[in-house]
């Protein structure tokens, strides 16, 4: 697909709008029964989603219009604030064994979501100064790796292993794209793997989740239930699906049907064509985001657009791979579709950064 430079911004915003609209429709049908069960009002969760979506559009406009140089200069205070927010989660109660949220006046905030923004701006600012002819020695990379390691370990200690793995993959891809020597990237990955394995084995439930993923039918009514239910929902959708609102898996048959496994609801009700449309939108989102990055007029803007696009795309692909049984079930949700106020707000903030970069593109 070849797109004129002048059309990139329009194409990107159109895909973004389609993702938001499609996600809203699928969220409504996936949350209808749960909302009725929890509150007696089938529309309660949907209206809550609309409120968060309105707020997220305001955030989008802020990040689309804010000075990127201002963000670049203020990144260290932002990192410090993010660090304290993540540390504050250890004072909050656990949910499903993880300390991911801060609760305040009935509102929950997930600081690891905010770290996506901090991570994007910090790495973009740092890598924008990189010159492989002058500073490709390992000493140049110690600072970003140390900062990343601090946040990564804190997220692991929250018992949010899946988010930690997500950030690690994102970090490695960005290092590779930044022209870091391949030998360094390889050495970092080789070092990371045993460390990651140790953290994995420290919690027996993580190991059992891996075994359930490898052999879900060994425990079909227990640890393998989510995977089997998700696959059955996707299979039952066929080509055209059962019809919007006509799915059964959301009726209490699949836990997290409106969050982690919302893709299964989509597949059951809208079929293979609905699934293909969603995946195509995510690929187009990354495609246009990437081309906005390579046609930006500075290295800093390149990384802002690239990392923001990659962060959303990578998360979406991980969630989809979980739904189709190619990754173990985790707490990774589907951007634009799944429930979660922090998630949609941060997703729209990153989308706003891409839009910000798209306002001034170059043919170079």
From Swiss-Prot:
Q: Name one Pfam family in it.
A: FTSW_RODA_SPOVE
- Pathway, per record: Cell wall biogenesis; peptidoglycan biosynthesis
Membrane side Cytoplasmic: which residues?
1-12, 65-74, 122-136, 179, 293-301, 355-364
Give a GO cellular-component term: cell division site
Residues in the Periplasmic compartment per record: 34-43, 96-100, 158-160, 203-271, 323-333
Listed InterPro entries: Cell_cycle_FtsW-rel_CS (IPR018365), FtsW (IPR013437), FtsW/RodA (IPR001182)
Q: Which terms are listed as keywords in the entry?
A: Cell cycle, Cell division, Cell inner membrane, Cell membrane, Cell shape, Cell wall biogenesis/degradation, Glycosyltransferase, Membrane, Peptidoglycan synthesis, Transferase, Transmembrane, Transmembrane helix
**So where does this one cross the membrane?**
13-33, 44-64, 75-95, 101-121, 137-157, 161-178, 180-202, 272-292, 302-322, 334-354
Its predominant location is membrane
Keyword Glycosyltransferase among record annotations: yes
Protein's membrane topology: Multi-pass membrane protein
Query: Which PROSITE patterns does the record associate with it?
Result: FTSW_RODA_SPOVE
User: Where found?
Assistant: Cell inner membrane
Q: Which reaction does it catalyse?
A: [GlcNAc-(1->4)-Mur2Ac(oyl-L-Ala-gamma-D-Glu-L-Lys-D-Ala-D-Ala)](n)-di-trans,octa-cis-undecaprenyl diphosphate + beta-D-GlcNAc-(1->4)-Mur2Ac(oyl-L-Ala-gamma-D-Glu-L-Lys-D-Ala-D-Ala)-di-trans,octa-cis-undecaprenyl diphosphate = [GlcNAc-(1->4)-Mur2Ac(oyl-L-Ala-gamma-D-Glu-L-Lys-D-Ala-D-Ala)](n+1)-di-trans,octa-cis-undecaprenyl diphosphate + di-trans,octa-cis-undecaprenyl diphosphate + H(+)
Domain of life, per UniProt, equals Bacteria
Has the keyword Lipid biosynthesis been applied to this entry? no
What are its E.C. numbers? 2.4.99.28
Q: GO molecular function of the protein, one example?
A: lipid-linked peptidoglycan transporter activity
Q: Name one GO biological process term.
A: cell wall organization
Q: What does this protein do?
A: Peptidoglycan polymerase that is essential for cell division.
Record family assignment: Belongs to the SEDS family. FtsW subfamily.
Family annotation (PANTHER family): CELL CYCLE PROTEIN (PTHR30474), PEPTIDOGLYCAN GLYCOSYLTRANSFERASE FTSW-RELATED (PTHR30474:SF2)
Kindly provide the name given to this protein in its UniProt entry.
Probable peptidoglycan glycosyltransferase FtsW
Q: Please give the organism.
A: Borreliella burgdorferi (strain ATCC 35210 / DSM 4680 / CIP 102532 / B31) (Borrelia burgdorferi)
């Amino acid at each position: 697909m070849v797109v004129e430079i002048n059309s990139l911004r329009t194409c990107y915003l159109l895909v973004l709008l389609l993702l938001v609209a499609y996600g809203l429709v699928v969220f409504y049908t996936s949350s209808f029964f749960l909302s009725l069960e929890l509150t007696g009002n089938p529309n309660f969760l949907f209206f809550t989603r609309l409120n968060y979506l309105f707020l997220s559009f305001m955030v989008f406009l802020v990040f689309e219009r804010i000075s990127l140089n201002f963000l670049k200069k203020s990144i260290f205070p932002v990192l410090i604030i993010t660090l304290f927010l993540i540390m504050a989660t250890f004072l909050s109660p656990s949910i499903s064994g993880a300390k991911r949220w801060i609760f305040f006046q009935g509102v929950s905030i997930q600081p690891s979501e905010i770290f996506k923004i901090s991570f994007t701006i910090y790495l973009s600012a740092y890598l924008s100064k990189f010159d492989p002819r002058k500073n490709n020695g390992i000493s140049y990379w110690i600072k970003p790796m140390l900062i990343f390691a601090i946040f990564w370990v804190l997220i692991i200690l929250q018992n949010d292993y899946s988010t930690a793995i997500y950030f690690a993959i994102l970090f490695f891809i960005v290092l590779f794209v930044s022209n870091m020597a391949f030998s360094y990237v390889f050495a970092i990955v080789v070092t990371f793997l045993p460390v990651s394995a140790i953290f994995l084995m420290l919690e027996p439930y993580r190991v059992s989740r891996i075994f359930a993923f490898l052999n879900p039918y060994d425990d079909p009514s227990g640890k393998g239930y989510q995977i089997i239910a998700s696959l059955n929902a996707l299979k039952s959708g066929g080509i055209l699906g059962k019809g919007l609102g006509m799915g059964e898996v959301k009726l209490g048959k699949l836990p997290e049907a409106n969050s982690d496994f919302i893709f299964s609801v989509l597949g059951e009700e809208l079929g293979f064509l609905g699934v293909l449309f969603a995946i195509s939108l995510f690929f187009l989102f990354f495609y246009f985001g990437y081309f906005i990055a390579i046609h930006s007029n500075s290295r800093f803007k390149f990384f802002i657009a690239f990392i923001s696009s990659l962060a959303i795309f990578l998360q979406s692909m991980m969630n989809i791979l979980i739904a189709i049984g190619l990754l173990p079930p985790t707490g990774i949700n589907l951007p634009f579709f799944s429930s979660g106020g922090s998630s949609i707000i941060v997703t729209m903030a990153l989308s706003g950064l891409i839009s910000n970069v798209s306002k001034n593109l170059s043919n170079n």
